[in-house]
A protein has these predicted regions:
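Nucleic-acid endo/exonuclease domains
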Residues: 2-127
Length: 127
């Protein structure tokens, strides 16, 4: 490993890969991510991060002030393999004290106002 010889740890390589991947994902949002971002999240009165690295995961949207993660799920997330990955990911995020809201892309397309209201309630009306 040339990187290790040059004094770069495997952890740093992993983090760089995640960082590069997050940057790529921010540049290539899905139609539903763009809709939620440009038509709702970016104008909220609190900071919303897109494609945020948390641990070894990249979450779609993260609101630190509300300890809230928002994930938009395409059809692949309904496959058994993806569901197991999502369960593991959600368990880690919950162990960090975060709340996870998951919405199917179809929900964004068919009930956008309802999704926005649900997110608003979790941010501003939490107990």
């Amino acid at each position: 490993m040339r990187a290790v010889e040059e004094g770069i740890s495997m952890g740093q390589l992993h983090n760089k890969k995640l960082r590069d991947n997050a940057r790529t994902l921010r540049k290539s949002m899905t139609k539903e991510e763009r809709h939620l971002w440009y038509d709702f999240l970016k104008d909220l009165p609190i900071m919303v991060h897109r494609q945020k690295i948390i641990g070894n995961y990249i979450v779609d949207f993260y609101i630190a002030e509300a300890k809230l993660v928002i994930e938009l799920d395409g059809s692949q997330h309904f496959e058994e393999e993806w569901q197991k990955k999502d369960e593991s990911r959600d368990a880690f995020l919950k162990s960090q004290g975060l709340t996870i809201l998951r919405y199917a892309n179809s929900h964004i397309n068919q009930n956008f106002q309802g999704v926005c209201q649900d997110i608003w309630n979790h941010i501003f009306h939490r107990e």
